[in-house]
Swiss-Prot record:
Binding note for cofactor: Binds 1 heme c group covalently per monomer.
Gene Ontology CC entries for this record: photosystem II; plasma membrane-derived thylakoid membrane
Name this protein carries in UniProt: Cytochrome c-550-like protein
Cofactor: heme c
Topology relative to the membrane: Peripheral membrane protein
Stored InterPro entries: Cyt_c-like_dom, Cyt_c-like_dom_sf, Cytochrom_C550, PsbV_cyt_c550-like
GO terms, molecular function: electron transfer activity; heme binding; iron ion binding
PROSITE patterns: CYTC
Organism: Thermosynechococcus vestitus (strain NIES-2133 / IAM M-273 / BP-1)
Annotated signal sequence range: 1-34
Length: 175
């Protein structure tokens, strides 16, 4: 009967151990993020597992947001904005989405944390000429400034990197 040499058994154990270590090393970060309450969308589509810097204003100042912050922002978006802004589109006005291009093109631009918070506190039409009645005014009693900043961070990150966010047209899904 064939008996493997000691070194052959050792290599087998070493390979098995390395495989287990490698699997643990690749699975552990995702498991840790999930345990911290990070939404998989934030990891997979917003590509944030740690922190991200986002523009606070047009003077180049930035603020750091964590994956947990963006998860909270996503939750706020789902609870308060998703009915009109599915996937970054704008159902009441499909010509103006939450794409980065459209956010930058608004008057005034809405492509920073501060400008999005200001818009949500006092919504204006896309050209800035009049009050917007299609977007609800968000009072301090409804969402705090910190919550609005977190919501704005989610929108800006999605607009920058999420596939399909704010696309201009949807494929016809009818058979």
């Amino acid at each position: 009967m064939y008996q493997p040499h000691f070194w052959q058994r050792s290599i087998g154990w070493l390979c098995g151990g390395l495989l287990i270590l490698l699997l643990g090393w690749t699975i552990a970060p995702a498991t840790a993020l999930a345990a911290a309450g990070v939404d998989n969308y934030v990891i997979q589509y917003l590509k944030v597992t740690d922190t991200v810097e986002l523009p606070v204003n047009d003077r180049g100042e930035t603020k750091t947001f964590t994956a947990v912050d963006l998860t909270r922002g996503k939750r706020l978006f789902e609870e308060n904005c998703k009915n009109c802004h599915v996937g970054g589109s704008t159902l009441p006005n499909p010509l103006v989405s939450l794409s980065l291009k459209d956010l930058k093109g608004a008057t005034p631009p809405r492509d920073t944390i501060a400008s999005l918070v200001a818009f949500q506190r006092s919504p204006k039409s896309y050209d800035g000429s009049e009050e917007s009645y299609s977007c609800r005014r968000v009072s301090e009693d409804w969402l705090t400034t910190e919550q609005l900043e977190t919501l704005a961070a989610f929108i800006l990150r999605a607009a920058a990197v999420a596939p399909g966010w704010g696309v201009e047209s949807f494929p016809d899904s009818a058979p």
